[in-house]
Amino acid sequence: MKAVEPRFFSNGSVTRLETRDIDELAQYMKHADIELIQIGRTITPSSLTQVSFDKINLQVGHYGAPYISNATIDKDRSGMVYKVNKDFPTTCNGYEIDSASFMYYGKNSEHIAINNGLCRWIYISFKPDYLEESLLDPLGAKLDTRRNVSSHLRCQAQASLDSLYEIVNEITEFANSNPLIFHNTDVTKGMEWSLLDTQVLILSNTLNSSPKNTYRGKKSRESIIRQSIDFLKANSYEPIHVLDLCSALNVGMRTLYYAFREFFGISPITYLRLVRYAKARRDLLKADPARTSVTDIAAKWRFWHFGRFSVEYKGLYGESPSETLNKGMEI
């Protein structure tokens, strides 16, 4: 049988490879020194998609054959490995990975895995110290992040994991069908924000945590809400991520969450998303449709999945974003 040539694409921030030889993926994987050993017949082609963001790196792989994987994680970066499909068993570092569990790999730690069939996985690695300082600290979460240490973790909210898988699938689809969109920094920042949101939700439903600061009573939570509103007003012309808000107020994620749930009945992530919709609507009403597009404004406010943006926008305001844009010229 004639060998099938691998298909490879790279434009700097996005890399895509599809091949029949599973071990060929190893040379393209980032932030790990990895060896892949095939242990069964090839069922489908294998593939790897990589997207480099500012604070994190996303790698999505599909192994089209049973394999053994031996790897050493980058000495400067840590990360999370998730397995998406559950139709074949996978063992990582002696732990069976099921629908609610995933692996954390510290800097320079060992990854030893065996999979007995097809495997689709996600690896999210963080720039040096970002996980500890910008995710775990606001969450008040306890995780052993020492070098050479790995941990088997269990998430208590399947919906949080499913949200990650959905977002990663959408990003991967863009990488396959429209890779030039990754040259738009507003779009890539929006994608990164979505990935960070999923990590916040997953870790908050996985790790034991303690409040960074202790606030008791309605007065303290009222103060947090007032400070949040003041901060958002002072930065009204730029999108704010929930981690930025935690940092600005010097409060933990759990404290912020309880305050927003008490006063608004929604999480701070949802609140900030609604604020971004309101800002996008403001810009649509003010914009000249001859010079500005809906996608330009959506991307500015970190909405990168334009189909979802249109549907959710219409659900909020009873009209499509394009109708708002054209209506603005009539006012």
Regions found by a protein language model. Give the residues of each.
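Alpha-helical DNA-recognition elements
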Residues: 262-263, 315-316, 327
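Short histidine-centered beta-strand/loop micro-motifs
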Residues: 62, 68-74, 92-94, 113-116
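Short hydrophobic/aromatic patch on the recognition helix
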Residues: 256-260, 308-309, 313
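Conserved short histidine dyad/triad with adjacent acidic residue
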Residues: 41-48, 56-73
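Short acidic (Asp/Glu) patches
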Residues: 62-67, 83-88, 106-109
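Alpha-helical bundle regulatory/interaction domains
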Residues: 2-35, 39, 43, 89-236, ...
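Cytosolic nucleotide-binding catalytic cores of signal-transduction proteins
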Residues: 271
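Short, conserved beta-strand element in jelly-roll/cupin
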Residues: 72-88, 124
